UniProtKB/Swiss-Prot annotation:
Similarity section: Belongs to the UPF0758 family.
The protein's name in its UniProt record: UPF0758 protein HCH_01020
InterPro entries named in the record: MPN (IPR037518), RadC_JAB (IPR025657), RuvA_2-like (IPR010994), UPF0758 (IPR001405), UPF0758_CS (IPR020891), UPF0758_N (IPR046778)
UniProt organism field: Hahella chejuensis (strain KCTC 2396)
GO terms for MF: metal ion binding; metallopeptidase activity
Length: 224
C-alpha cells in the first residue's frame, strides 16, 4: 500500500512534523530520505530492506557505491545524497567543536572522532589541537597505515603543534578490526609523544581508540 494511503498519523513525514525526528525509527527516517520506493514497495519497505541487508545503519552509511547499488531501487542519486548527508553530519559536529566552544564534553569528543575515523578500512592517526582554554583550533589526520612507533613521528607532531600554536592536544586513531581495546603499542606511542611534547610545554590530554560503536579513552583508563 502506498504511504499516501496510510492513516495520516502513521506517515513518516507527518509523524516527524507532529512529534519531532527523535520519535521516528531509523527505517522511518531513511524512508523520508529515500522519498520514493519501487514498484510494489513503499519507501518504508525499501528503507527496511536496505537496513536489514546491511545489518544496521552504520554499515549502510559506510557502504561503497558498488555495495549500495546491489539493492533494487538504489542507485547513484540516492547514494550521492546519502554521502552528502553523512558529510553534513560530520561538519555539523565539527562546527559544534570550533574555537568558540570549550571542549568540556567527553561524549561530544567521542562522537566527533568516531564520525571521522570509524569508517576507514586502515588505521588513521589523528589529532585535535587545542588552545589554553581547551577550545578546538584544528583537527588533522596525521598518519595512515599501520600505527606503531615506526610510523608515528614525534618530530612531525611537534611541528604541527607549533604551527597551530596549540597548548594541548588529544590524539585518536581507529582500529579497523572494530575492537577498541588499546594495545601495548598504543600505550608506548602515547608515552613517546607525551615526552616529546613536554619539551615544548604542550599537554597530551587523551588518546582515544575508535572501534565499531565504541571509543576507549586512555586517560579514563589512567594511562595518561
Amino acid at each position: 500500500m502506498p504511504i499516501s494511503d496510510w492513516p495520516k498519523a502513521d506517515r513518516p513525514r507527518e509523524k516527524l512534523i507532529a512529534h519531532g525526528s527523535s520519535k521516528l525509527s531509523e527505517t522511518e527516517l531513511l524512508a523520508i530520505f529515500f522519498r520514493t520506493g519501487t514498484r510494489g514497495r513503499s519507501a518504508v519497505d525499501l528503507a527496511r530492506d536496505t537496513i536489514n541487508h546491511f545489518g544496521g545503519l552504520r554499515p549502510l552509511l559506510d557502504a561503497s557505491f558498488e555495495e549500495f547499488r546491489q539493492i533494487p531501487g538504489l542507485g547513484e542519486a540516492k547514494f550521492t545524497q546519502l554521502q552528502a548527508a553523512t558529510e553534513l553530519a560530520k561538519r555539523y559536529l565539527q562546527e559544534k567543536m570550533q574555537r568558540s566552544h570549550n571542549l568540556t564534553s567527553p561524549e561530544l569528543t567521542r562522537e566527533y572522532l568516531s564520525a571521522h575515523l570509524r569508517h576507514y578500512p586502515y588505521e588513521v592517526f589523528a589529532a585535535l589541537f587545542l588552545d589554553n582554554q581547551h577550545r578546538v583550533i584544528a583537527y588533522e589526520e596525521l598518519f595512515r597505515g599501520t600505527i606503531d612507533s615506526a610510523s608515528v613521528h614525534p618530530r612531525e607532531v611537534v611541528r604541527r603543534v607549533l604551527k597551530h600554536n596549540a597548548a594541548a592536544i588529544i590524539f585518536a586513531h581507529n582500529h579497523p578490526s572494530g575492537v577498541a581495546e588499546p594495545s601495548l603499542s598504543d600505550k608506548e606511542i602515547t608515552e613517546t609523544l607525551r615526552k616529546a611534547l613536554r619539551l615544548v610545554d604542550v599537554r597530551v590530554l587523551d588518546h582515544m581508540i575508535v572501534g565499531d560503536g565504541e571509543v576507549v579513552s586512555l586517560a579514563e583508563r589512567g594511562w595518561i
